[in-house]
Amino acid sequence: MKFSLALLATVALATISQAAPVEKQVAGKPFQLVKNPHYQANATRAIFRAEKKYARHTAIPEQGKTIVKSAASGTGSVPMTDVDYDVEYYATVSVGTPAQSIKLDFDTGSSDLWFSSTLCTSCGSKSFDPTKSSTYKKVGKSWQISYGDGSSASGITATDNVELGGLKITGQTIELATRESSSFSSGAIDGILGLGFDTISTVAGTKTPVDNLISQNLISKPIFGVWLGKQSEGGGGEYVFGGYNTDHIDGSLTTVKVDNSQGWYGVTVSGLKVGSKSVASSFDGILDTGTTLLIFDQATGSKVAAAYGAKDNGDGTYTISCDQSKLQPLALTMGGKDFFVPADSLIYVKQGSQCIAGFGYSSMDFAIIGDTFLKNNYVVFNQGVPEVQIAPSKA
């Protein structure tokens, strides 16, 4: 489900504090940052994709760090590549036997593992060739995903081995594209790896990669830690399955309850402040690594924009001052603690003499807490409880 908003959303532009046990990582193979010259910042498209993505499941309108190959310790670390202005983050994942490298956007807002293949005659990227994998098994169920900008993809299901940070999942359900819109061909990624709950999988009854990491005893804890870097600080990012990396945590982790009744990592934001000024009371939000922006409902977005003197562009985006010294931090209160979005992230991109804000609005009645927030705050996602733990992040 995330694919719709997350993967492409990113393409678009697109209670109690608890100290947690230390989870360390081991030095491994470095990954280089990759830039895609075809990408263009487009906040409007990010908003459209987000709306379409979530409408499917609700009735309401590198510099990468290091890889850890340590299955014995029950954790696996996957480095991420940061594309352009933090538009999206992807990892290179191994699929099949022998392994084929697939670039996937990791998305906590969806639950499908989707990518292009040689079965698709219209795909710009034919990343996976099933005829070259000895462990590939065709299942043949149909799937289809569409997006708010009119783009779409569809295909069939199969199973194969998938490796994440040295952790090899056997018999993982994969969705192979047999058709996709032309807009996919210029993207940096080959598909999406959904990290949401299996209740929102496009193909009913499908186990997600996290489900299989748990059931196949590949990770010691049903958690994964997420650090997303900033281009201004060298880019990159990292997912740690089965643990988290304290090297990217600045302070203590705060536990926040999760409502997963709709398949997402839903949280309650109990307050919203610009500087010391309160601009909104309690509202619901979804922690979504696959969405570029911080997207509010329209009423909340209007209040935030007014506090910053931002102009509504009429398409879900705002024009904001390019002078960071005039922008106070935006604080979201969760679990009794404030978590901040600093001035440098309140400006998403400069277009000519104007700047587009890192926040926007949609017609939905909940917020999508995307990368504008997540690249400033480390999150440990716990599928087992469910809950999340959040702390300020550091590069």
From Swiss-Prot:
Gene that this sequence comes from: SPSR
Disulfide pairings: 120-123, 322-355
Keyword annotations from UniProtKB, A to Z: Aspartyl protease, Disulfide bond, Hydrolase, Protease, Signal, Zymogen
Gene3D superfamilies documented for this protein: Acid Proteases
Native source organism of the sequence: Syncephalastrum racemosum (Filamentous fungus)
Pfam families xrefs: Asp (PF00026)
N-terminal signal peptide: 1-19
InterPro entries xref list: Aspartic_peptidase_A1 (IPR001461), Aspartic_peptidase_AS (IPR001969), PEPTIDASE_A1 (IPR033121), Peptidase_aspartic_dom_sf (IPR021109)
Subunit-level organization: Monomer.
Family per similarity comment: Belongs to the peptidase A1 family.
Its EC number(s): 3.4.23.-
UniProt name for this protein: Syncephapepsin
Leading EC class: hydrolase
Biological role: Hydrolysis of proteins with a broad specificity. Residues recognized to be cleaved were primarily those of trypsin and chymotrypsin and Lys was the most susceptible.
Active site: 107, 288
A GO BP annotation: proteolysis
